[in-house]
Amino acid sequence: MAKGKFERTKPHVNIGTIGHVDHGKTSLTAAITKYFGEFKAYDQIDAAPEEKARGITISTAHVEYETENRHYAHVDCPGHADYVKNMITGAAQMDGAILVVSAADGPMPQTREHILLARQVGVPAIVVFLNKVDQVDDPELLELVELEIRELLSKYEFPGDDIPIVKGSALAALEDSNKEIGEDAVRQLMAEVDKYIPTPERPIDQPFLMPIEDVFSISGRGTVVTGRVERGVVKVGEEVEIVGIRPTSKTTVTGVEMFRKLLDQGQAGDNIGALLRGIDREGVERGQVLAKPGSVTPHTKFKAEAYILTKEEGGRHTPFFTNYRPQFYFRTTDVTGVVTLPEGTEMVMPGDNVTMDVTLIVPIAMEERLRFAIREGGRTVGAGIVASITE
């Protein structure tokens, strides 16, 4: 496959391999690059560089490849803890995942945990690669494993009966030892991924939202709020809401500027200043958001999925219990919240990932899948995601 320059003409999709340790995630990643990208050997992918996301160090390998229909950015993590951290911090956003399961072992504890995490962090779709099928001679056993995987997916509210399961061997693909379960299976897998994993909506097509980072008053002109537009478009003359911390208020954007130049609109990715009509300097603050009216609402209570840093990662040295009161850093500001642990969980140790209920002392513009950091006095001790809103 000739490598031309990166063509922006194809839709872009972020994807990743998930599944139990040693079931073949990295070998499969290498095999996909062999047929659809610039070949990366197992060792190149496995020696993933460390990166920091929200103050947390994560090892992640990034590869890219393309099918006829799409361009893919693919993440693969060497260790289980890296997956947990990656999915919770959203360091590697996943529009879909390839779940790798060894046919010889069937679903294992991390298989289950990664499916649960995918559900909690809102990975929209999963395609399954049943790996190492050459190690299983009995077709009935293969069927049984497939059934087990489908049941497990359904249990975590994925459409287990409809999810494509492709059977093959990543090793056979890498070694060219058996075309049918090697190359053919990898090509079939990517055809299923192309078909089954939906193309994500581009940020610019979503309703406007901008977290407010700073507030200025400009004499004779009014109040300007600055920030980076997270999604959507805002045009001069449009009505917006200011949401979070205080009661929601409405205003009109009377000007948009970027790099000191006046624009008629600001869009996803732009760092802008928005001039607001009839709002004084005291009427708005960092931590609120500017949003399309009715698109986002303020909440104080939610269920979270969180990863708590180990001591070595710079986190807490001791466990915490129900009624723990750290700060939750959403977008641009810290808000104190009270933690309630689920029944049967007495305490949370550094290094755990946990589902917990949180009640904030002031409301924040919130939606499912919003990420946050957990902090104590400005120091990050955990990362989390809003799994569901309770109130």
UniProtKB/Swiss-Prot annotation:
Keywords: Cytoplasm, Elongation factor, GTP-binding, Hydrolase, Magnesium, Metal-binding, Nucleotide-binding, Protein biosynthesis. InterPro entries: EF-Tu_GTP-bd, EF-Tu_GTPase, EFTu-like_2, EFTU_2, G_TR_CS, P-loop_NTPase, Small_GTP-bd, T_Tr_GTP-bd_dom. Residues 55-59 are annotated as: G2. It is found in: Cytoplasm. SUPFAM superfamilies: EF-Tu/eEF-1alpha/eIF2-gamma C-terminal domain (SSF50465), P-loop containing nucleoside triphosphate hydrolases (SSF52540), Translation proteins (SSF50447). GTP binds at residues 19-26, 76-80, 131-134. It catalyses: GTP + H2O = GDP + phosphate + H(+). Residues 10-201 form the tr-type G domain. GO terms for molecular function: GTP binding; GTPase activity; guanosine tetraphosphate binding; translation elongation factor activity. Residues 169-171 are annotated as: G5. Residues 19-26 are annotated as: G1. Its main location: cytoplasm. One of its GO terms (cellular component) is cytosol. Signal peptide: none annotated. Mg(2+) binds at residue 26. It comes from the Bacteria. Residues 76-79 are annotated as: G3. Monomer. GTP hydrolase that promotes the GTP-dependent binding of aminoacyl-tRNA to the A-site of ribosomes during protein biosynthesis. Belongs to the TRAFAC class translation factor GTPase superfamily. Classic translation factor GTPase family. EF-Tu/EF-1A subfamily. This is Elongation factor Tu.
